[in-house]
A protein has these predicted regions:
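C-terminal alpha-helical "lid/dimerization" subdomain adjacent to the S-adenosyl-L-methionine
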Residues: 130, 134-176, 181
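C-terminal lobe and adjacent flexible extensions of AdoMet/dcAdoMet transferase-like proteins
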Residues: 193-200
């Protein structure tokens, strides 16, 4: 199971770097110690490793991977990546002021109230005008969802989560003081939703 998840995450990482302008995270840094990206629940780091390989602007820049202690203990070291034990359900985000916080396929596992809790644990780390949250999830269309999205929705309903339409995602984000800047659809079913703190 862990191996299949790792493979899926690696393939997804390749899709992400082709769609979202991650190179912008490595530009105009105020300090060489500034953290450009935090991968929340990032497993063994397949997505970050792919970014290091394909986004030249991130080479030599500091990134952080967070996951549960057992996962972090078993990690293979990655250059320029710090591994930090973190439970996004119970603890406030410990890495403050990063350029971006990546939550990929995290929120679909949980009902709305837990999604809000995860986001509220992340928000204190954001610096207004600098930090953003990148949510990678399936956005179901208003009608006739693709078969993969529909199957995922049915599967996750057993756990209280599931796929959501754009208006449902927006409602969750706005309820905790976040707003969508832009949605970046990938070639597959996922979309990257770029969030920032509300301007007012």
């Amino acid at each position: 199971m862990a191996k299949s998840v790792a493979t899926e995450r690696a393939l997804a990482g390749k899709g992400l770097v082709d769609i979202y302008p991650f190179k912008s995270l490595g530009e105009g840094l105020s300090s060489p110690d500034e953290i450009v990206l935090v991968d929340v629940g990032g497993g063994q780091g397949q997505v970050l490793e792919d970014m290091r390989m394909h986004v030249l602007e991130l080479n030599g820049k500091k990134m952080v991977l967070e996951d549960l202690p057992k996962t972090v203990e078993d990690h293979v070291p990655l250059e320029d990546v710090d591994f930090v034990p973190y439970d996004f359900l119970t603890v406030e985000q410990p890495v403050k002021g990063a350029r971006a916080y990546l939550l990929r396929h995290i929120l679909h596992d949980w009902p709305d109230r837990i999604c809000r809790k995860i986001l509220l644990n992340t928000i204190p780390a954001l610096v207004k005008g600098k930090s953003k949250i990148l949510i990678v999830e399936i956005i179901l269309p208003p009608v006739n969802p693709p078969i993969f999205g529909a199957l995922m929705d049915i599967q996750m309903m057993n756990y209280g989560g599931g796929g959501r339409k754009e208006r449902q995602w927006r409602a969750i984000f706005e309820s905790v003081g976040l707003e969508i800047v832009k949605i970046w659809p990938t070639a597959k079913s996922d979309s990257v939703m770029e969030l920032v703190l509300k301007s007012s």
